[in-house]
C-alpha cells in the first residue's frame, strides 16, 4: 500500500543509499533526490511492489530455460513527476520505471506486458506527448486523490475480524463446520512454503518441522496426549465446549487475532463461548431457576410469561449428546496444535531479550520481521539478531559490527518467510495470493515469446511499426553498458538547441538525448549515429556505450532528451560480477551487493574509485610487462654475446693455417711408414736354402719325436686300463665285504637286543614271584596277628563272663536269704492275733480267720512257681546276664527273685564285653561288594541265631565252678547248646584241610600249607 509523504521521509532517513544501514551506527541523511531503490517517486513507493520487483528476477533466473543474457531492461511509463535533478538539469520526467538484470528482462508499458526477446529487451521509451499549453508535465501525472488513496487502505482490525469469523462459524451447519475444520486441520500438515519434490524428501521439512510449526513427531505426540485426556477425563459438556474452542482457534487464526498485542481477543472469544455453553447447560438453568424461585425473586407466573422470549436453543429439555468421533478427532488436533503454538511462542518470548527502546520511529517494513527474528532465534538456537533489509535480504547485527553485510543461509530466510506468512491474517493471505498470482501471470505473458522461440535480434525488428524514441539495451558488461536507439527526429525537433556536448559527432549531427546514471550526468557515455544504414530500412539510428561502471552494482540509467530535458525512459541495470581472476584479485568488490542504485555522489565516487582501480591495475600490468621485457632482453643479449663469441673464435685464419699444416705433416709421416712396411713384406717373400734345409731337418726330428710320444701315450693308456680293472674288482670285493660286515653287525645287534629282553624278562619274572610271595607272607602274618588278637579277646571275655556268673550266683544266694527272712517275718505277722496297725483294723478290711484259710494254701504247689502264704507268684525273669552275648550258656538251678535287682548290683561290664561279639549277627552282617554275594559270612551255619533269638544258657553253677577251663581252649564253644562247631572265620585260600589245635600263644589255626601254621608250630 502506498505510504504518505511524511512516513516516506521518516523511513527514508533510516535507509542507506547502498542498502541497509548498520544498526549500531548513525546513518547520515541523503542529500540526493528520491531516485533510490529503483523508484523515481520516492514518496509513493509501494513496499509490496518493490519487494516483488526485487525478488522476481532472482527467483526466475534459474527457472526459465531460455533467457537472453545480453539485455536487461524493463520500462514503466506515464508516472508521476519528481523533484529536479541536481546534475542533469532535468526539471521533470515521465517517471519511467525500468528494472534490468543480466539474466532476464521484461517490459511493462501502460499495464500491458510485451516481450521482444533476444538482444532487444523491449520498448523502453516513448515519445512524450506535449500538452497544448506547452507545459512539461503530462496531464496523466496528476496527484492521487486523498479520498481515493484512503479508500484503498484496508485497516487492520483483528478483534472485529476474529469475532465476525467466530460468529460465522458458529452459525454454520454441522456438516459444513466439520468440512471447515477438516480443511483447517489439513493445513497444519502442509509446509508453509508449499509442497515440492525437495521438501517431501527433506528430513528437516518432514521430521524437524519448518520454522513456526512443530515437527510431525511433535504433532502426533501432542494429538495422542490430548486424545488420551479427551477419552479419560472429558465428560459430555466438556467435550462440546472443547469442540467450540476449536472454532475459536480457527477464527483467531483466520482473523489474525492471536498475533501482536491482541491478547484480549483470545480471552474475549473464549469468554463468549464459555458464557454461551453455561447459559445453554440444562443443569445450570435448573440450578439458577430453582434458586430464583426458592428465594422468591421471580415468581413462576413471571417465569412462564417471559420464557417464550428466550431462543429455542437456550431452552434445553434433554441433556447434550457426545459429538461424533470425526469431529472429536478434528477438535483434538486443532486444540493440540494451538496449545503447542502458544507454548512455543511463550518460550521464544521468555528466551529472547527485549530490544532496547529508542526514541526513533521504526520503519514498518523493518519491524515486520521483529517477531520473525524472535522465533527464528528460538528455532535456530542462535543469539544473533537479524532484520529484513530494504533490499529484501536478512542482515545480521554481527555482520554490521564487522563492517561487512553477510547474507544468511537459504534455510533461515525460508524459516523467517514462513513465520511472517503464518502470522498474516486471512485477508492479508488472500491479498498476497492475489498479488503473487497476478505477478506470475504478467511475468509468464512477458516471457511467453522467449520461452517458445529463439531469441530475437535487431534484424527481427525490421518492418515493425514501433513508436519513435525507442531505446534498448544490447549488451551488459562488468564495466560497460551498450545500448541502441531509434530515430528521434520529428517535425517539431528541427532545431538543435539545448544539446549536450557530443563525443564523436559533428556539428551537423547533434545528440538527441544524453545519459544520467543514478541522477548524475555521465560524462563517459558516448553516443554515435549510425551513418551506413539507410533511413527507414533499419531500426538502429543511434548506438552508445556507458563506461566506467563498477562490477556487481545496481545502476539507474536515465535517458533525457536534449531539447526538452524530458526523461525518455529509466532503466535499472545491475552489472554482473567480473570473471577475470586478475581483476578480481586486484579490485575488491563489496561483500554485500546492493540491489538498488546509489546516489549520484556515491555513483561518481564509485566510478572514480573503479577508474582509479583500473588505472592502478593497468599500471601494475605495465610494470610487470616492463620487468618481463627487461628479463627477456637480458636473456637475448646473453645469447647474442655467446653466438658472437663462438663466431669470432671459429673464424681465426692463423689457427686454421696451423691446423692444416699439422694435418699435412701427419699425412706425410703416415705415407712414409706405409712404404717401409711394404718393403719389409717384399723381402720376407724370398726364403734362403740353408734356412729351408734346417727347417726340413728340424721337421723330421719333430715327427720322430712325435711318433715316440704317441707310442708312449698308447702304452700309458693300456696300463691305466688294466690298473683300472684291478681297482674296480678290488672295490667290488671291498663293497661286498662291507655289506656282509654290516649285515653281521645288524644281526649281532638284534641278537643282543633279544638277549637283553630275555634276561630282563627272566629277572622281572623272578622278582615278581618273590614280590608276590613276600606280599602273601605279609598278609598271612597280618591275619595271624589278627587271629591271635581275637583269641586273646575271646579268652578275656570268657574269664569276665565266669567272674560275672560267680558274682551273680552270690547275689542270688543273698536274695534267697533275704526272701526267706521276709517270708518268716510275714508268717510271724500273720500268725500274730493282734491288729496289723497300732490303731487297730482298718475299716472295710476283712481280717483273715484261721478257719477260713487252710494250711495247705500257704505252701507252694509247683516247683516252677513260688508261693508265699497262699499267694502264688509267676516265675521270675531270667537274669540280665543271661540275655547278654556270651559264648558260654548256663542256667541257674535257683529260683529267681520276684523283686527287682538293686541298682548297685549293675556292675559295668568290660569294654570288650560291651562291644559286639564276633558270634553276634551284627558282627557277621555287613554289606559286601560284588565278590561277597552273601549278606552274612558263609563260614557260619544257617542255623546261627542272633542275640534276639538266642536261647538262654543252661549252665549249672556247680559244674561251672567244678570244671574251669583255660581261656584259650577251643572246646568252650561247645558249651552253647544252640551253636554248632564251625570253621575259622579266617580260612586261607592255600589250606586243603581243616583241624583244631593250640599253640603256645593260645591262638588256633587250620591248614597245613599256611605259613602262619608253620610259624605257630615253630613258635
UniProtKB/Swiss-Prot annotation:
Keywords: Coiled coil, Membrane, Transmembrane, Transmembrane helix, Ubl conjugation pathway. Residues 1-94, 109-143, 343-371, 580-603, 831-855, 879-905, 963-1019 are annotated as: Disordered. Residues 68-83, 131-143, 580-589 have a biased composition (Polar residues). GO terms for cellular component: membrane. The chain crosses the membrane at residues 163-183, 216-236, 259-279. It is a multi-pass membrane protein. This is Probable ubiquitination network signaling protein acrB. It comes from Aspergillus fumigatus (strain CBS 144.89 / FGSC A1163 / CEA10).
Amino acid at each position: 500500500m502506498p505510504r504518505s509523504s511524511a512516513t516516506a521521509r521518516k523511513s527514508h532517513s533510516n535507509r542507506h543509499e547502498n542498502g541497509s544501514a548498520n544498526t549500531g551506527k548513525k546513518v547520515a541523511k541523503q542529500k540526493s533526490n528520491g531516485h533510490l531503490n529503483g523508484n523515481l517517486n520516492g514518496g509513493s513507493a509501494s513496499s509490496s511492489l518493490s519487494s516483488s520487483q526485487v525478488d522476481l528476477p532472482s527467483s526466475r533466473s534459474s527457472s526459465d530455460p531460455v533467457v537472453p543474457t545480453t539485455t536487461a531492461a524493463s520500462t514503466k511509463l506515464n508516472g508521476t513527476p519528481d523533484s529536479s535533478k541536481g546534475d542533469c538539469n532535468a526539471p521533470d520526467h515521465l517517471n519511467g520505471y525500468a528494472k534490468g538484470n543480466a539474466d532476464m528482462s521484461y517490459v511493462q508499458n501502460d499495464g500491458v506486458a510485451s516481450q521482444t526477446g533476444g538482444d532487444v529487451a523491449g520498448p523502453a521509451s516513448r515519445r512524450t506527448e506535449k500538452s497544448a499549453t506547452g507545459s512539461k508535465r503530462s496531464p496523466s501525472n496528476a496527484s492521487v486523490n486523498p479520498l481515493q488513496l484512503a479508500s484503498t487502505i484496508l485497516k487492520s482490525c483483528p478483534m472485529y475480524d476474529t469475532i465476525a469469523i467466530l460468529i460465522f462459524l458458529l452459525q454454520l451447519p454441522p456438516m459444513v463446520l466439520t468440512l471447515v475444520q477438516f480443511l483447517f486441520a489439513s493445513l497444519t500438515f502442509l509446509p508453509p512454503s508449499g509442497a515440492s519434490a525437495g521438501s517431501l524428501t527433506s528430513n528437516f521439512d518432514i521430521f524437524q518441522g519448518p520454522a513456526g510449526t512443530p515437527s510431525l513427531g511433535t504433532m502426533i505426540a501432542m494429538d495422542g496426549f490430548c486424545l488420551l485426556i479427551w477419552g479419560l477425563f472429558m465428560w459430555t459438556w466438556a467435550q462440546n465446549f472443547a469442540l467450540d474452542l476449536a472454532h475459536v482457534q480457527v477464527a483467531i487464526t483466520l482473523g489474525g487475532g492471536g498475533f501482536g498485542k491482541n491478547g484480549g481477543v483470545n480471552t474475549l472469544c473464549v469468554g463468549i463461548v464459555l458464557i454461551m455453553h453455561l447459559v445453554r447447560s440444562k443443569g445450570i438453568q435448573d440450578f439458577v431457576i430453582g434458586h430464583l424461585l426458592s428465594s422468591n425473586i421471580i415468581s413462576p407466573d413471571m417465569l412462564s410469561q417471559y420464557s417464550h422470549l428466550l431462543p429455542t436453543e437456550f431452552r434445553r429439555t434433554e441433556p447434550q449428546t457426545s459429538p461424533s468421533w470425526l469431529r472429536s478427532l478434528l477438535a483434538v488436533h486443532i486444540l493440540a496444535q494451538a496449545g503447542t503454538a502458544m507454548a512455543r511462542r511463550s518460550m521464544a518470548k521468555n528466551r529472547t531479550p527485549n530490544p532496547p527502546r529508542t526514541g526513533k520511529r521504526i520503519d514498518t517494513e523493518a519491524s515486520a520481521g521483529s517477531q520473525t527474528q524472535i522465533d527464528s532465534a528460538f528455532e535456530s538456537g542462535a543469539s544473533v539478531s537479524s532484520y529484513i533489509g530494504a533490499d529484501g535480504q536478512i542482515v545480521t547485527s554481527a555482520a554490521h559490527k564487522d563492517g561487512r553485510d553477510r547474507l544468511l543461509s537459504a534455510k533461515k530466510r525460508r524459516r523467517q518467510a514462513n513465520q511472517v506468512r503464518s502470522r498474516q491474517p486471512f485477508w492479508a493471505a488472500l491479498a498476497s495470493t492475489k498479488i503473487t498470482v497476478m505477478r506470475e501471470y504478467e511475468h509468464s505473458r512477458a516471457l511467453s515469446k522467449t520461452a517458445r522461440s529463439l531469441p530475437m535480434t535487431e534484424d527481427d525488428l525490421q518492418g515493425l511499426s514501433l513508436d519513435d524514441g525507442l531505446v534498448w539495451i544490447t549488451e551488459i558488461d562488468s564495466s560497460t553498458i551498450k545500448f541502441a536507439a531509434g530515430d528521434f527526429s520529428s517535425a517539431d525537433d528541427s532545431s538543435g538547441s539545448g544539446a549536450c556536448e557530443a563525443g564523436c559527432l559533428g556539428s551537423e549531427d547533434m545528440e538527441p538525448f544524453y545519459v544520467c546514471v543514478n541522477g548524475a550526468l555521465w560524462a563517459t557515455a558516448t553516443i554515435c549515429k549510425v551513418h551506413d544504414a539507410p533511413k527507414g530500412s533499419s531500426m538502429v539510428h543511434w548506438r552508445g556505450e556507458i563506461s566506467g561502471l563498477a562490477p556487481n552494482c545496481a545502476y539507474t540509467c536515465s535517458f533525457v532528451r536534449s531539447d526538452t530535458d524530458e526523461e525518455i525512459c529509466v532503466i535499472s541495470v545491475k552489472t554482473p560480477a567480473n570473471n577475470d581472476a586478475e581483476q578480481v584479485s586486484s579490485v575488491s568488490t563489496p561483500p554485500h551487493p546492493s540491489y538498488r542504485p546509489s546516489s549520484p555522489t556515491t555513483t561518481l565516487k564509485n566510478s572514480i574509485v573503479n577508474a582509479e582501480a583500473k588505472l592502478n591495475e593497468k599500471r601494475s600490468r605495465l610494470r610487470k610487462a616492463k620487468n618481463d621485457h627487461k628479463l627477456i632482453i637480458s636473456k637475448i643479449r646473453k645469447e647474442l654475446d655467446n653466438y658472437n663469441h663462438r663466431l669470432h673464435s671459429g673464424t681465426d685464419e692463423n689457427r686454421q693455417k696451423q691446423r692444416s699444416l699439422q694435418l699435412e705433416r701427419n699425412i706425410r709421416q703416415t705415407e712414409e711408414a706405409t712404404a717401409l712396411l711394404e718393403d719389409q713384406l717384399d723381402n720376407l717373400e724370398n726364403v734362403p736354402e740353408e734356412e729351408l734345409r734346417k727347417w726340413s731337418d728340424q721337421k723330421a726330428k719333430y715327427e720322430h719325436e712325435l711318433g715316440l710320444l704317441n707310442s708312449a701315450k698308447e702304452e700309458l693308456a693300456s696300463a691305466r686300463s688294466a690298473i683300472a680293472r684291478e681297482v674296480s674288482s678290488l672295490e667290488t670285493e671291498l663293497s661286498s665285504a662291507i655289506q656282509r660286515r654290516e649285515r653281521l653287525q645288524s644281526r649281532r645287534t638284534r641278537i643282543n637286543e633279544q638277549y637283553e629282553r630275555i634276561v630282563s624278562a627272566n629277572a622281572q619274572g623272578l622278582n615278581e614271584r618273590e614280590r608276590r610271595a613276600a606280599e602273601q607272607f605279609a598278609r598271612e602274618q597280618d591275619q595271624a596277628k589278627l587271629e591271635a588278637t581275637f583269641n586273646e579277646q575271646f579268652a578275656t571275655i570268657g574269664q569276665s563272663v565266669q567272674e560275672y556268673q560267680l558274682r551273680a550266683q552270690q547275689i542270688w544266694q543273698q536274695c534267697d536269704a533275704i526272701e526267706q527272712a521276709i517270708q518268716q517275718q510275714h508268717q510271724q505277722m500273720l500268725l500274730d492275733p493282734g491288729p496289723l496297725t497300732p490303731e487297730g483294723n482298718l475299716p472295710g478290711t476283712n481280717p483273715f480267720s484261721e478257719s477260713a484259710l487252710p494250711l495247705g494254701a500257704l505252701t507252694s504247689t509247683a516247683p516252677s512257681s513260688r508261693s508265699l502264704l497262699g499267694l502264688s507268684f509267676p516265675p521270675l525273669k531270667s537274669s540280665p546276664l543271661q540275655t547278654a552275648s556270651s559264648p558260654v550258656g548256663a542256667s541257674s538251678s535257683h529260683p529267681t527273685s520276684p523283686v527287682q535287682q538293686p541298682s548297685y548290683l549293675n556292675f559295668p561290664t568290660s569294654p570288650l564285653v560291651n562291644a559286639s561279639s564276633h558270634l553276634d549277627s551284627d558282627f557277621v552282617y555287613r554289606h559286601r561288594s560284588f565278590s561277597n554275594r552273601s549278606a552274612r559270612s558263609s563260614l557260619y551255619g544257617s542255623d546261627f541265631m542272633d542275640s534276639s533269638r538266642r536261647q538262654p544258657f543252661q549252665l549249672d553253677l556247680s559244674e561251672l565252678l567244678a570244671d574251669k577251663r583255660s581261656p584259650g581252649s577251643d572246646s568252650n564253644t561247645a558249651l552253647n547248646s544252640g551253636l554248632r562247631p564251625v570253621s575259622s572265620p579266617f580260612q586261607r585260600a592255600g589250606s586243603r584241610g581243616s583241624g583244631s589245635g593250640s599253640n603256645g600263644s593260645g591262638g588256633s589255626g587250620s591248614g597245613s600249607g599256611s605259613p602262619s601254621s608253620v610259624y605257630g608250630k615253630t613258635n
